[in-house]
Structure formats: structure tokens, C-alpha cells
A protein has these predicted regions:
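Glycine-rich beta-alpha junction loops
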Residues: 36-39, 82, 125-126, 152-154, ...
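Short clusters of hydrophobic/aromatic residues that line enzyme substrate/ligand-binding pockets
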Residues: 67, 132-134, 147, 189, ...
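Glycine-rich phosphate/diphosphate-binding loops and the adjacent beta-loop-alpha structural elements
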Residues: 193, 197-206, 238-249
């Protein structure tokens, strides 16, 4: 039986979630979309043409206050507040919260008040709402948790890799840098950005140092690593795909070959479908559209001694 979902927000994540759900209708039924700035013809245009993922293959038209995809009709609403949305009437039970505006339990509870049963925040929560990363701590999920966070794209890449390394060798300390593709909040020319002045600099001709909460979030989903990891971000002028650079001091002496073997084993067993092990000469565009949250690059790691290692893992920061 298909899971009945509603999508709140129609930015990059909302549109990608819709694309993926429509590809597997036996698993997901999209009951409704809420888009505050609704213009159905523009929504059709944004779905049909995508600068990163290419032209959408299905027929799509605007029809009767909604979108028609071949034989699938999805109603579209224009609500400013989640508690005004008819989730209950449409049958939507699980809400993909992708606006970026609802990051706390109190805010997401408005979806529940409107008839939804569960809410998945597609970003780190701003409060203590439970955070889960598949392959890392998803077995801790309980059915009474009605608002959860799926963490960030970077955390979903970093945490599975960190778990494999920590479980096998132990991590004493770790530093992480994500070399991250541009995002929608960045500016095409120098402009004001109050929270982070450097993020306000032009995206096309700068490498921009910034912050990331991904390493700290690893300490939430893997509590024994709390306080042992920290990191930063370098924003670069590419449209999609990012790479995690993890440097760690290990508790157990080992070799780089043994580390690669541990990651490969995990990719074939308990992390299958989450980690992909790659030993080819790859570059960033090779991972556009990758379903894996963590694409381990076996050829790019380096090691000094038997306890100090640098590891690289790629991820599609939109699709993955």
C-alpha cells in the first residue's frame, strides 16, 4: 500500500521529492502540494525544465487547481500557514516539510492540527525534535514520534562514513570540511547577507568559507562522538554535488587498505543502498542524481602513520 504524502514547499527539495515520488507510485501517493507563491503554469515550467537534472520525462499540465502528470492528478494549495491546509481532506498522512520555515515541533504541529499524522523536516531541526540519518540511528525511531528531522545533506553523507570508521577503529577526534556546491540563498553578485557577510559575496567567482552544523549533528545521531567532531564549509561555484573531506585520528592503529575494506564491507551489507564504494577516477559531475547519501572515494584517501587518515565521500546535495 502506497504511503500518502503531502509536500509543503516547491523549491529544490520539494520538486525533487515530487519527481522521485512520481517515479515509484506503488510506494508513494502524492496527495497534495502546498506552495505559497502558487502559479500553476510556472510550477509546470519548473518541473518540466531543470538546469541540473534535465527535462522531466512525464507529460505535465496545469489543470483544475492542480498538476496533471500523465494519469496522476495532484491538487495544489496556496496556504500561508500550515494549520489552514486541508491535509486531512486530501488524505495526506506524511508531510515532506521542505519550505525551510518549519523547523521546530511547535511549527510542524500545525501540520498535525490540519490532519496530517507525521512530519519529516528536510533539514536539521531548530529544537530537540528527533533527528535521524538512515543507516546510522534510524532504528531508534518510535511510532509515537510524529515530527522528525532528516538532518542535512552533508550530515547524511558524513554520518554513515563516520559510523563505519568509529565502529571499526574508533575516532578520537575529527575535522570535516564540506566542499559544497552553491545553494539558493547565495548571491549572483555581491549583496547584503546579514547572518554571514561572506555568503553575500558573488557565488560565480568566489570560493567562500562558511559554517556547517553537519559535524555537530553527527554527535546527535552518534552520541558517543559528541564533542569529538567539528567542521566548516567551502562554498564553490558549481550547481550541484558536494564532497566531504574527513580527517580523523583513530583509536586503533590500522592501514588505509583496512579502512577501505571496512567501508566496502559496509556498502555491501548493513549500509547497502546508503554508502556506495567507488574505486574509479571520478569527479563531481559523476554523482549528479546519485541515490546514495555517501559515495566513498577509495582512490582519494591518504594516511600518515597508522592512526591519522583523510577520507573523501561525494554526495548529490539535492537529489541524494
Amino acid at each position: 500500500m502506497a504511503i500518502k504524502i503531502g509536500i509543503n514547499g516547491f523549491g529544490r527539495i520539494g520538486r525533487i521529492a515530487l519527481r522521485q515520488a512520481l517515479e515509484i507510485p506503488e510506494q508513494f501517493e502524492v496527495c497534495a502540494i502546498n506552495y505559497r507563491n502558487v502559479d500553476l503554469e510556472h510550477m509546470v515550467y519548473m518541473m518540466r525544465y531543470d538546469s541540473t537534472f534535465g527535462r522531466y520525462g512525464k507529460k505535465i499540465i496545469a489543470k483544475d487547481n492542480g498538476l496533471q502528470f500523465d494519469d496522476i492528478f495532484v491538487p495544489v494549495f496556496e496556504g500561508d500557514s500550515a494549520d489552514t491546509l486541508p491535509w486531512g481532506k486530501t488524505g495526506a498522512e506524511y508531510i515532506v516539510e521542505s519550505t525551510g520555515a518549519y523547523k521546530t515541533y511547535d511549527r510542524c504541529k500545525l501540520h498535525l492540527d490540519a490532519g496530517a499524522k507525521k512530519v519529516v523536516i528536510t533539514a536539521p531541526a531548530k529544537d530537540k525534535s528527533p533527528m535521524f540519518v538512515m543507516g546510522v540511528n534510524n532504528t531508534d525511531y518510535r511510532s509515537d514520534m510524529d515530527v522528525v528531522s532528516n538532518a542535512s545533506c552533508t550530515t547524511n553523507c558524513l554520518a554513515p562514513l563516520v559510523k563505519v570508521i568509529n565502529d571499526k577503529f574508533g575516532i578520537i577526534q575529527g575535522l570535516m570540511t564540506t566542499v559544497h556546491s552553491a545553494t539558493s540563498k547565495q548571491k549572483s553578485v555581491d549583496a547584503r547577507y546579514a547572518k554571514d557577510w561572506r555568503i553575500g559575496r558573488a557565488v560565480f567567482n568566489n570560493i567562500i568559507p562558511s559554517s556547517t552544523g553537519a559535524a555537530k549533528a553527527c554527535g546527535i545521531v552518534i552520541p558517543e562522538l559528541a564533542g569529538k567532531l567539528t567542521g566548516m564549509s567551502l562554498r564553490i561555484p558549481t550547481p550541484d554535488v558536494s564532497v566531504v573531506d574527513l580527517t580523523a585520528r583513530l583509536a586503533t592503529p590500522t592501514t588505509y587498505e583496512a579502512i577501505c575494506a571496512a567501508v566496502k564491507e559496509a556498502a555491501e551489507t548493513n549500509m547497502k543502498g546508503i554508502i556506495d564504494y567507488c574505486a574509479d577516477d571520478v569527479v563531481s559531475t559523476d554523482f549528479i542524481g546519485s541515490d546514495y547519501t555517501c559515495n566513498f572515494d577509495a582512490k582519494s584517501g591518504i594516511m600518515i602513520g597508522d592512526d591519522f587518515v583523510k577520507l573523501l565521500a561525494w554526495y548529490d546535495n539535492e537529489w541524494g
